[in-house]
Amino acid sequence: NGLGLQNFPELKNDTFLRAAWGEETDYTPVWCMRQAGRYLPEFRETRAAQDFFSTCRSPEACCELTLEPVRRFPLDAAIIFSDILVVPQALAMEVTMVPGKGPSFPEPLREERDLERLRDPAAVASELGYVFQAITLTRQQLAGRVPLIGFAGAPWTLMTYMVEGGSFKTMAQAKRWLYQKPVASHKLLGILTHALVPYLIGQVAAGAQALQLFESHAGHLGSELFSKFALPYIRDVAKRVKAGLQKAGLTRMPMIIFAKDGHFALEELAQAGYEVVGLDWTVAPKKAREPVGKTVTLQGELDPCALYASEEEIGRLVQQMLNDFGPQRYIANLGHGLYPDMDPEHVGAFLDAVHKHSRLLRQN
């Protein structure tokens, strides 16, 4: 499985990987969540031809969409164009993307017996060959320019979609499961963990050079529910992926955990087996550094809406952020994905400001 690895072009810019491992870098590396997104005119053009999940299933389309922001901007990493919901799809759940509304599951999980409808999690990776093909193709096309990040959704976040049938403000149905059906909840979270581990290992075998786990709905859980229903599975994914990579003779990869609005669990996340902890903009950099120290690299956390500000103001905000995080053990990013109405010029200004100010910071 990992035999194709040596055929990839040599990596020219490894700043992102070095920062992830905690090594010193000449400047602070930067990338953006949803950097391949609708804010780019070329993205809208490429995407116009087919519906969302058909695009996800086309390795050529995913490769092109992944490369577009890298061609345009001085990014230090690429992240494969895909979606976290390909995993529930591979578990035999129907998911459609409704324009203007988001994902929809026509038949969400309502009762414990609905879990019997799910495909064997061991078969999931074989259903997701199109993601692996997209990663291999993209890694070749990147020609070593920057590292390629693979990703997946964390078990709790995937569970919310599968039970709610979409994305809802309160996640009341999913949380009802946690309170009323704790055994079934753990069973479902276990199934998802079993599906995710070979999927993430497969991404590395296909050419991914780092992995990010998105716990996008961490904020719906308080610390007690989080430590019961999210954290154990986040830990388990990291532990099993690392063991699996070693067993398969694959290179170890830095892993990133991004638990949005999960600031109440920062200390636990820093000890969950990931090299990098992603932050959203509600966490002050200095406050985030206190509980985690220099044991992990932090990633984030500019408010994406700051990109609506003037380029001058963006520069000032970036400078402040870099000063607060310090020069080492840090990867710059936004605290969430880019929004469709953002100005690509302002995205460029953000990236340039990170590179410029982080070099100056090191000189002083």
From Swiss-Prot:
Cellular component terms per the entry's GO annotation: cytosol
EC supergroup of this enzyme: lyase
EC number(s) stated in the UniProt entry for this protein: 4.1.1.37
Positions bearing the site annotation: Transition state stabilizer: D83
Subcellular location: Cytoplasm, Cytosol
Record-level Gene Ontology MF annotations: ferrous iron binding; uroporphyrinogen decarboxylase activity
NCBIfam families per the UniProt record, alphabetical: hemE
Subunit field text: Homodimer.
Family: Belongs to the uroporphyrinogen decarboxylase family.
Protein name: Uroporphyrinogen decarboxylase
Organism lineage string: Eukaryota, Metazoa, Chordata, Craniata, Vertebrata
Gene designation: Urod
